[in-house]
Amino acid sequence: MRTLRESLKALATKNLSARELLDASLAAIDADLARGGATYTQIDRLAAREAADASDAFRARGYVPSALAGVPVSVKDLFDIKGQVTTAGSRILRDAAPAVRDAAAVARLREAGAVFVGRTNMSEFAFSGLGLNPHYGTPMNPAHAKRLAGGSSSGAAVSVALGHVVAALGTDTGGSVRIPAAFCALVGFKPTARRVPLEGTVPLSSSFDSVGPIARSVDCCVLMDGIVSGQALDTAPRPLAGLRLGVTSDYVADDLDDTVSTAFNRAIGMLQRAGATVERFAFPELHEVAGRYPLAGVTAAQAWAWHREHVARDADAYDPRVLKRLRVGEGRSAADYIDLLAARERFVRDSRSRLARFDAWLMPTVAVVPPAIVQVENDDEAFFTTNAKVLRNPSVVNFMDGCALTLPCHREGELPVGLSICGPALADASILSIGRSVEVLLRHSANGATA
């Protein structure tokens, strides 16, 4: 599948029409369905064809609203699309009324001329990092069919990896864009949360929910982010020579899978040889996150506030594993919640201070390679243990109110591994600029070339 820039060029030079791009997209989707794929909860072929034909007609008259005009994209089934039911990957909302308007991010994509091919499958209510879904099926990792694609934006990543779309719109509360991007060897960007409006999106945690893209390149993510945020950032590549990059052994480096550790350390070595300064630093505050956020945290309390009425009416319709995590929030007192918010405020301050001397903080996106489906599908203990480990690293960035970009850093023949380039709130432009240069370096090495 082409990148956004390549698709734009093909459309601009009339080598392809929007309808031809869509036909290729739908053919790839049909092939996935024939194999039993569970990438989507809904595919609206008629609306997609109407949008593609309209884009071609507008282009013929000289009207091209953006680089996304006429380009197929997918939308996570957490966003309202006018006239459609938003299920959030759950049976609970199947009979809800259709949305009367687009979610804010979807409306911006529509105004930009994007062609929506379907609503992508996900972990129920976005409350898992693994991507399992007992209601709509579990999207499989495209490169490794017996392994998980990651979650919660599982279908979003698969839709890009299989070439259905050039980019996908997802959400990230504790890694839900970056985990599936890393597991599917893609690029994923979690922006500073407040940059993209959340109106019309089913919430998980109002403190941490972020809207971000999954795509094949940093450039694709920049283009998507510029549209959904309404902000055109200056993301010109920054030279690697002279960059000051931080790496810590605290918490996020604990118990790494050997493949992850090897790929991460190899990437660090490449950056050093390219002229970047990599400094090892202590980050003891991360251990407070380990004690507070993943176990009970703000997310569970805020999720329970939204779900409690649904649980009271229809608890049996929930995935039992999601319900168990939701009920953690049921027992939180007001005092507990205030303490959690205060802990978060301290961590935001402390992390900003710790990272102030660096251009970016680097860590493995996920501590493990994509788990085998059979490992967690029918074993609750394995599910919760693996889910916690998968969420561990990326959730730190949400807790510190930061932004992060994940890039593939494995080599051909290795299981997928992601390298995260992280920064504090509103460092988005800098992180994307650095990401452009790191991406070139890593791609040079992907086939075993020496940097």
What is each model feature region?
Residues 31, 68-210, 250, 363-383:
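Short glycine/serine-rich loop/turn segments
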Residues 68-91, 242-244, 297-349, 364, ...:
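Short helix-loop capping/hinge segments that flank enzyme active sites or metal/cofactor-binding pockets
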Residues 6-12, 57, 308-399, 450:
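Serine-dependent amide/ester hydrolase catalytic core
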